[in-house]
Design a protein with these regions (language model features):
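Glycine-rich, histidine-containing beta strand-loop boundary motifs that form or position
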Residues: 69-73, 91, 111, 131-135, ...
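FAD-binding subdomain of flavoenzyme oxidoreductases
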Residues: 97-100, 109-111, 115-246
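Conserved oxyanion/phosphate-binding beta-strand-loop segments in alpha/beta enzyme cores
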Residues: 9-31
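C-terminal substrate-recognition/cap domain of FAD-linked oxidoreductases
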Residues: 231-421, 435-440
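Glycine-rich N-terminal segment of FAD-binding domains in flavoprotein oxidoreductases
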Residues: 23-26, 30-94
Length: 476
């Protein structure tokens, strides 16, 4: 049988202990916590070397078999579900931190390095990186960088992909290439001034190559942390007045914070560990909770930063904004990496967690949160929305989070509809979807420059003419 032939060829490359076509294994790689429909791969393969990946990609080309890169299936968004079958290539055993260069300020990691592993090793040397927010420490670090994810230092340094300094990638023909300055220099310190080809990989969801090494900026780790909290006391129907959005922009422009984040009341209750169904929001509690986090290398520096932030909040209150300070003493004790995703997936029971995340102008959060509340209300769900301002302060993450019961078909169908309506809200607000499932990409392309879509297809066809790399992604 053809399947037996392929199995034997795969086993020749990685060893029989690292390949499986048994149903119970395939099922584990057929889905994730989102509502994206499951799809069985034909094989699961675990690679441990770059050379193995090259051989696997060449085999996939020869046999016209799809190949989907994954890191232990720890990434949400349905992006590693093998929609056309084929091989799921699990890279979690390639988990070495190859270099931490303190003199130049970067680290080089393999794709299987976890969030917790990277943080622990860097902490020993007094450094840190912008860690993906939400996933547990056991989740892969690399996906949150190459898919434009958000990190806990995003208010100071921007989205995670902006921290990438270089990469090594296996291209769809099996060739190995370095991208960024490391293609010329022995050091992985910057992606320019050479032609920046990382755009052929970043955000492409594994459809143009497999990243085998990633260079990331590292920063000295401050010893001291402070957090200032405030609530926005408005109504569910008009949750974020434009005046409050402009206050957030002003606070971000002060350039004192590493993170400015907000949550709807319902999202805060999940963070507190409360389960579905939630009681109605008490009138005395805010519609939105916000906090600003800053760090410093000395207590004196921290005190100055915290005081300025507190004074800005006081100015907002005295100017008549509907805000008041909130106690964030306990929350300030929480350190990265967090386990928020686990709390969300357990909120309604059944382990389901879907979301649509975006980068959206902060000034348009006013209409965005209002309309997202309407979507949640329409389907009988509590509004769970997270907000974070990126470096530059004028745009940031607006993400609708949808915990659901995977065993409840009504829940599943409701969340699928909510996700699609959420995409429309975000696009109406001028936002862009990150980690976008195919249906969200299709909606973006409908509104976009048709020649941009033509170029995407041309790049994909040029790099991957046999269409083996994670086919069915990006609405292409």
């Amino acid at each position: 049988m053809a399947g037996d032939k392929i199995y034997a060829l795969l086993a020749d490359i990685v060893g029989s202990e690292n390949v499986s076509n048994e149903l119970h294994t395939l099922q584990g790689y057929s889905c994730d916590p989102t509502t994206n429909p499951p799809s069985l791969p034909d094989y699961v393969v675990i690679a441990t070397t770059v050379e193995q990946i090259q051989k696997l990609v060449r085999l996939a080309n020869k046999e016209r078999i799809p190949i989907v890169p994954a890191v232990g299936m720890s990434n949400n968004g349905g992006l590693t579900i093998p929609v056309e079958g084929g091989i799921v290539l699990d890279l979690h055993k390639m988990n070495k931190i190859i270099e931490i260069n303190e003199d130049i300020g970067y680290a080089i990691v393999e794709p299987g390095v976890t969030i917790g592993q990277a943080d622990a090793e860097l902490k020993k040397k007094g450094y840190w990186i912008s860690l993906p927010v939400g996933p547990p420490g056991s989740a892969g670090l690399l996906p949150g960088y190459i898919l434009h994810g958000y990190g806990h230092l995003g208010g100071k340094f921007g989205i995670n992909s902006e921290q990438i300094t270089g990469m090594e990638v296996v291209l769809p023909d099996g060739e190995l290439a370095k991208l960024g300055g490391c293609a010329v220099s022995p050091y992985w310190f910057h992606r320019t001034p050479v032609p920046d080809l990382m755009g052929l990989i970043l955000g492409w969801q594994g459809s143009t190559g497999i990243v085998t090494k990633l260079g990331i900026n590292i920063y000295p780790r401050p010893r001291f942390k402070a957090m200032v909290g405030w609530g926005i006391f408005t109504t569910h129907e008009e949750p974020l007045p434009e005046s409050c959005a402009r206050f957030l922009i002003k606070l971000g422009r002060a350039d004192l914070t590493y993170d400015i984040s907000g949550h709807t009341w319902g999202a805060v209750q999940i963070g507190r560990g409360l389960k579905y169904p939630l009681s109605p929001k008490p009138e005395e509690e805010p519609e939105l909770y916000f906090s600003a986090t800053t760090y410093a290398f000395t207590e004196e520096e921290l005190e100055v930063k915290k005081k300025i932030i507190e004074n800005l909040v006081k100015e907002g209150i005295s100017s008549g904004l509907p805000i008041a300070t909130t106690d964030v003493t306990e929350r300030a004790k929480v350190e990265m990496p967090t386990k928020y995703a686990l709390k969300y997936s357990d909120h309604r029971g059944g382990g389901g967690l879907d979301y649509i995340g975006s980068i959206t102008p902060v000034i348009n959060w006013t209409q965005g949160i209002k309309r997202l509340n309407e979507v949640f209300d329409k389907y009988g769900f509590t509004s769970y929305i997270r907000l974070s301002i990126y470096r530059g302060t004028l745009q940031g993450m607006m993400r609708a989070i949808m915990p659901y019961n995977r065993g409840d078909e009504n829940d599943v169908e409701a969340v699928r509809k909510m996700a699609r309506e959420t995409v429309q809200v975000i696009l109406d607000c001028g936002g862009l979807i990150y980690k976008a499932p195919s249906f969200a990409c299709e909606e973006m392309w409908k509104r976009g420059d048709p020649n941009f879509l033509k170029l995407l297809k041309k790049v994909k066809q040029t790099l991957d003419p046999n269409r083996i790399m994670n086919p069915g992604r990006l609405g292409l």
